[in-house]
C-alpha cells in the first residue's frame, strides 16, 4: 500500500524548458535567438548537471546559474547580450515568474496532502532549491527535501532516494516516485520504489500527460 510519495522538480513541478521562462523575456526585449535553441539548452543543462554537485552554498550556486545562462544565451547566438542577461536572470531568482510551475503541480500536491500523504523532493539541484520552492509556493507541501548538491550524490544514485524514504519513515515498497527522466526511474527502481514517468510536454506516449493523473495510482 502506498503511504508516501517523492517528486522530482525540474520538468515535474517546475517547467525547465527555456521556451517557458527565457523566450518570453527575449521577445519582450525584442531579441530573437539566431542559434539552435534546443541544442543550446541541451548543452547548457549538460554543463549544469556536470557541475551542480559542487554548488553546495548559495554563492557557488548563483555563480553556476550565471554561467548556465551565459552558455545558453551564447548557444542561442546572443553573445552580445549574454553577460548582462545572465546576471539579470540570476537577480530575478526570487521572482516566481522565473520558475513557471507545471500545470496542475500545486493542485496535485495540495490534494495529496489533503489525503494525508507525506511528501518529499528527490532532485538533482543546487543549494538554491529550498528557497526556490518557497518562492513558488510549493515548499509548504513537503516534509523533506533530498537535494543532490546538499546530500552529495545525484540521481540515479539510490542513496538520494533512501535519504528521502528514511526521512518520511516508509519502506521503498510503500512509496511512489514521480519524475520525468530516466535517472528518476533507475534510481527509484534500484531501491525498490515504484516510479511514475511524467512528461509535461506530452512528447512521451508512455508517460503521464498530466500531473493530476498521479492520483489515479493511489488508493
PLM regions and their residue ranges:
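Asp-based, Mg2+/Mn2+-dependent phosphohydrolase catalytic module
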Residues: 1-7, 35, 79-83, 106, ...
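N-terminal helical cap/lid subdomain that shapes the substrate entry/recognition surface
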Residues: 2-103
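A short, Lys/Arg-enriched amphipathic alpha-helix followed by its capping loop at the start of a domain
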Residues: 28, 108-117
Amino acid at each position: 500500500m502506498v503511504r508516501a510519495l517523492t517528486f522530482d522538480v525540474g520538468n515535474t513541478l517546475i517547467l525547465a524548458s527555456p521556451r517557458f521562462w527565457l523566450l518570453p523575456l527575449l521577445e519582450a526585449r525584442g531579441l530573437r535567438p539566431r542559434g539552435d535553441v534546443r541544442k543550446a539548452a541541451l548543452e547548457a543543462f549538460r554543463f549544469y548537471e556536470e557541475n551542480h554537485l559542487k554548488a553546495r552554498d548559495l554563492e557557488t550556486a548563483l555563480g553556476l546559474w550565471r554561467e548556465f545562462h551565459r552558455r545558453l544565451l551564447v548557444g542561442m547566438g546572443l553573445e552580445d547580450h549574454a553577460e548582462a542577461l545572465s546576471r539579470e536572470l540570476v537577480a530575478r531568482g526570487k521572482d516566481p515568474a522565473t520558475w513557471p510551475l507545471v500545470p496542475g503541480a500545486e493542485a496535485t500536491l495540495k490534494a495529496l496532502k489533503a489525503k494525508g500523504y507525506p511528501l518529499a523532493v528527490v532532485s538533482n539541484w543546487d543549494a538554491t532549491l529550498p528557497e526556490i520552492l518557497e518562492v513558488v509556493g510549493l515548499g509548504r507541501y513537503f516534509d523533506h527535501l533530498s537535494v543532490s548538491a546538499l546530500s552529495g550524490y545525484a540521481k540515479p544514485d539510490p542513496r538520494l532516494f533512501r535519504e528521502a524514504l528514511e526521512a518520511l519513515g516508509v519502506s521503498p515498497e510503500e512509496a511512489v516516485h514521480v519524475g520525468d527522466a530516466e535517472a528518476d526511474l533507475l534510481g527509484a527502481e534500484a531501491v525498490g520504489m515504484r516510479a511514475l514517468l511524467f512528461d509535461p510536454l506530452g512528447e512521451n506516449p508512455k508517460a503521464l500527460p498530466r500531473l493530476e493523473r498521479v492520483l489515479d495510482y493511489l488508493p
